[in-house]
Amino acid sequence: NHDLWWSTSKKLREFLDDNKFNSIDFIFNNCAVCEGYAVAGTRGWFFDDKPDPKILQREAGRLELSLSAAEKTGLPILTFLHYPCVWGDEVCEEIFSVIKRHGINQVYHGHIHGAGVCKVKTEHDGVKFRLLSCDCVDFTPVFIV
């Protein structure tokens, strides 16, 4: 979720190999298959007064690649974003349009914290968004399937 230490996927995978970690994978322009599901996603983008078009298009492209890879598996797709692309009346159309184009109907996300927002349920144009920030789920793992 807060992967500020991320450098490159190649370096991260080398670290896993060097340390013999075989139960961890990274989603970066791809998907991961886990227990009969294709897990897809990207960081996404949050609403700013001045959005950065370069970052926004990059994140939309990464989500497109990840969901396309997930579709190729033929498995049900679980979609995760760090930033929600829908929050209240705000919609990040560049990201949301990728989700709609791929027929995704449930997206899990983090980023939002605080007691007042934890009970907010978000749905937009047939897509449900579920907030999984640690403080909003009492620091308890959430069973999602």
Predicted regions and their residues:
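Binuclear metal-dependent phosphoesterase catalytic core
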Residues: 10, 33, 101-102, 115-145
